[in-house]
Swiss-Prot record:
Residues that span the membrane, as ranges: none
Family: Belongs to the small GTPase superfamily. Ran family.
Name the UniProt record assigns to this protein: GTP-binding nuclear protein GSP1/Ran
Location(s) in or outside the cell: Nucleus
Binding sites annotated in the UniProt record for GTP: 15-22, 65, 119-122, 147-149
GO molecular function terms listed in the Swiss-Prot or TrEMBL record: GTP binding; GTPase activity
Function description: GTP-binding protein involved in nucleocytoplasmic transport. Required for the import of protein into the nucleus and also for RNA export. Involved in chromatin condensation and control of cell cycle.
Positions of region (Switch-II): 65-81
SUPFAM superfamilies on file: P-loop containing nucleoside triphosphate hydrolases
Pfam families for the chain: Ras (PF00071)
Length: 214
């Protein structure tokens, strides 16, 4: 008798070129099982994780480049149960556009757990520094530095979302997800420095910004 799997629609958004598809395809099941929804121009990647509370599957909706042609259709967001907003830490404009993606997502999905991810932290020319990443704190989202190419923090967004969706803050993954081999590596000292920067940034008071988008 096969074990029942809890499945959730995960909406993945962000500017084109931020590494969304690369990120999803790091997971082996996401690489070889994907369904293309031609109507919406969407690829759906089922990503499976084993937890100490049973198996969970995120059906990750990836835009397949549709965001380059303007906003996404509501059909992309409808019935979304959780979300990841991605930007590129080497491109300030992709972070500047995060509020737009967040607005569109919550307009349709309202109160769903959302993770903000700053991708490409393996690149030395980081433009969006930890201290300038404040949007998640204003909107009560979770934030992670990630690197799709090095697999750095790959499982963190999924673990946080799984805990929220299961209503169990102590839920753990019981097996490391099968990931494609890393294409690059991040020096452990650099990782520690990034983590320290994030912790210090999160401890700072939020700037007084009178900006409707934020």
């Amino acid at each position: 008798m096969s074990q029942e799997v809890a499945a959730f629609k995960l909406v993945l958004v962000g500017d084109g070129g931020t590494g969304k598809t690369t990120f999803v395809k790091r997971h082996e099941t996401g690489e070889f099982v994907n369904r293309y929804n031609a109507t919406l121009g969407v690829e759906v990647h089922p990503l499976n994780f084993a937890t100490d509370c049973g198996n969970i599957r995120f059906d990750v909706w990836d835009t397949a480049g549709q965001e380059k042609f303007g906003g996404l259709r509501d059909g992309y967001y409808i019935n979304g149960q959780c979300g990841i907003i991605m930007f590129d830490v080497t491109s300030r404009i992709t972070y500047k556009n995060v509020p737009n993606w967040h607005r569109d997502l919550v307009r349709v999905c309202e109160n769903i757990p959302i993770v903000l991810c700053g991708n490409k932290v393996d690149v030395k020319e980081r433009k969006v520094k930890a201290k300038t990443i404040t949007f998640h704190r204003k909107k009560n989202l979770q934030y992670y530095d990630i690197s799709a190419k090095s697999n750095y923090n790959f499982e963190k967004p999924f673990l946080w979302l799984a805990r929220k969706l299961a209503g169990n803050p102590s839920l753990e993954f019981v097996a490391t997800p099968a990931l494609r081999p890393a294409e690059t590596a991040i020096d452990p000292e650099v990782m520690q420095a990034m983590q320290k920067d994030l912790e210090e940034a999160n401890a700072m008071p939020l700037p007084d910004e009178d900006d409707a988008d934020f």
